[in-house]
From Swiss-Prot:
InterPro entries: IDLSRF-like_peptide, LDL_receptor-like_sf, LDLR_class-A_CS, LDrepeatLR_classA_rpt. Its main location: secreted. Residues 1-28 form the signal peptide. It is found in: Secreted. Disulfide bonds join 46-60, 54-73, 67-84. This is IDLSRF-like peptide. It comes from Camponotus floridanus (Florida carpenter ant). It comes from the Eukaryota.
Amino acid sequence: MVRRFCNGAVALGIALTACAAFPRAIMAIDLSRFYGHINTKRSDACHPYEPFKCPGDGLCISIQYLCDGAPDCQDGYDEDSRLCTAAKRPPVEETATFLQSLLASHGPNYLEKLFGNKARDTLKPLGGVEKVAIALSESQTIEDFGAALHLMRSDLEHLRSVFMAVENGDLGMLKSIGIKDSELGDVKFFLEKLVKTGFLD
């Protein structure tokens, strides 16, 4: 890489000298070979030591540069708040599978106990399991989640109270909304994963 850069720098110096000497020749100079090493890095598959490919410009960067506070991708995608939140949360596929298993085990309206009236009929009014799983993965806070799924304020406050009951170990409140003893473990497991990543902040 250093040799290629140095050769490129010499070539650029010669080209600029030629431009100064022959101003009309500026348009005829092809610098694509000078920039070729940059383009190949962006168009090839990423190396294991730089496995993240920026979606906008195709630049490969190290995982350590994701969500570090300094944009490395041209469009700043490596610092996108949704990406950084999703990096801390369980994968969307895992969340969707977990939601599906809750629905399969406890019935199509089970998640209404957590998310409110719009969660009836296997979450169809909220856009389905996949959309809810994505919103849980990308939403930094419960407020962001409510906005992403257009939850009513009452449903959002209900969800917040369920989270607080889980966090505080208030089994009485959870039972009062119809969560049975046999279901408590599943609900607690699911909600604690979100709480640990700042969902209630």
